C-alpha cells in the first residue's frame, strides 16, 4: 500500500503524451499476442470515448455562455480571422487532394452496395440540415451533441447574461470552472482509453483487410500528411511570420494523437480546450473557435471526399479537365463544412461529389462502402488533421494579434 502514493506521483510527473504512447504500444502488443484478452479491454476505449462525448456538449455550452457573459467591454476577440483560416485550410486541403489524385491516380475494386445508409440529396440538403441544427431545441441539442445548436444557444444566452447581476455571472463562471475540472479528470484517463481502443480495433479487424486498398490509403494519408506538415505550416507562417513548426508539432502531438484514436472531433473538444489553456490563448476566443472548428473546419473531410470521388472517376474512365477539378475542390470544401451535420460524416457526402461527374447513386454508394472498409485508418487520420488544425489556427490567430500569454508564447 505504501508504494501507491509513489506510483501516483510518478504518473503525475510523466507527461500525458508519453503515457498515451505507452498505452498505444501496450494495446498493439496485447492484440498481437492475446487477441481474446484485447477484445475484452476494448471496453476501456469505449468508456473513454463515451465519457468525452458526454462531457463535450456540456463543456461547450457552459464555457461559451460563461465567456460571453463575463466578457469585458473593449476586450477584443479574433473569431472572424480564425473562421477565414478555417475556410482557407479546408479549401487548400481539397486542392491538395485533387493534385495528389492527379499525380497518383487510384482505381477501386467496387464492393457490394451499402444499402443501410442514406446520403443527402444535394448541397441544399446539407445546408438545410445545418440551418435546422442552428434552431434546434437546446435540450435536444445537448442530448444529441448538436454543436451548431449548442453554440447558437450558448452565444444567445451569453449575450443575454451580460445584463444579469454580478452574482449570476460569477455563478456561471464557477459552473464553467467545475465542468473544466471534470474534463481534466476525464482526460487523465486517456492512456487507458487509447490502450483499449488500439487493442480492440486491432483484435477485431487487424490490418489484413486494408492491404487491398494500400495505394488508396497511401494517397489519402499522404495528402493529409502534406496538409499537416506543409500547407498548414505555410498558413501559420503567413499569420505569425516566424518558424511555425514548434506550434505545428505541439498541436499534432497534444491534440492529433488523441483525436486519431478517439476518431471524433466532438470527443476531442475537451482535449483541445485544455491545450489552448496551456498555450495561454484568450479564453473568450478559444471557447468559441474550438467547438466551431469541430463543426466547420474539415480539411480532412475535404481530402476524403475528393480522393475517393476522383478514384471512382478514374475507375470508370471519366476524363476530368482543370475547370471541373477546380469546381470539385469548391464543392468538396462546401460539403466538408457540412460533414458534421450529416450522419456518417464525410463518407456519405461522396455521392454529392460523384454527382458532379454523372456517377449514379448506386455506384457512388459502392465507393462509400469502400470508405467504410478503410475507415479504421481514413477516419482516424481525418479526425487527427481536423481536430489538431482547430487548435493550430486558433493559436496562430491569437499569436498574430498578440492575444497570448508571453510565457506560453515562448514555450511554442
UniProtKB/Swiss-Prot annotation:
Record's keyword terms, sorted = Amino-acid transport, Cell inner membrane, Cell membrane, Membrane, Symport, Transmembrane, Transmembrane helix, Transport
One Pfam match, given by its short name, reads SDF
SUPFAM superfamilies this protein is in? Answer: Proton glutamate symport protein
Q: Where in the cell is it found?
A: Cell inner membrane
Answer yes or no on keyword Transmembrane: yes
Q: Is Cell inner membrane one of the keywords UniProt gives this record?
A: yes
Broad class of where this protein is predominantly found: membrane
The organism sits in which domain of life? Bacteria
The alphabetized list of GO BP terms reads: serine transport; threonine transport
Give the record's membrane topology.
Multi-pass membrane protein
Q: Where are the bilayer-spanning segments?
A: 16-36, 44-64, 82-102, 115-135, 141-161, 179-199, 217-237, 298-318, 330-350, 357-377
Q: Which GO terms describe its molecular function?
A: neutral L-amino acid:sodium symporter activity
Reaction(s) catalyzed by this protein?
L-serine(in) + Na(+)(in) = L-serine(out) + Na(+)(out); L-threonine(in) + Na(+)(in) = L-threonine(out) + Na(+)(out)
Which is a Gene Ontology cellular component entry for this protein?
A: plasma membrane
The record's listing under Gene3D superfamilies reads: Sodium:dicarboxylate symporter
- State the function annotated in the UniProt record: Involved in the import of serine and threonine into the cell, with the concomitant import of sodium (symport system).
Instruction: List the NCBIfam families.
Output: PRK13628.1
**What does the similarity note say?**
Belongs to the dicarboxylate/amino acid:cation symporter (DAACS) (TC 2.A.23) family.
Name the UniProt record assigns to this protein? Serine/threonine transporter SstT
What organism is the protein native to?
Answer: Stutzerimonas stutzeri (strain A1501)
Q: What does the record give as the organism's lineage?
A: Bacteria, Pseudomonadati, Pseudomonadota, Gammaproteobacteria, Pseudomonadales
Gene symbol here is sstT
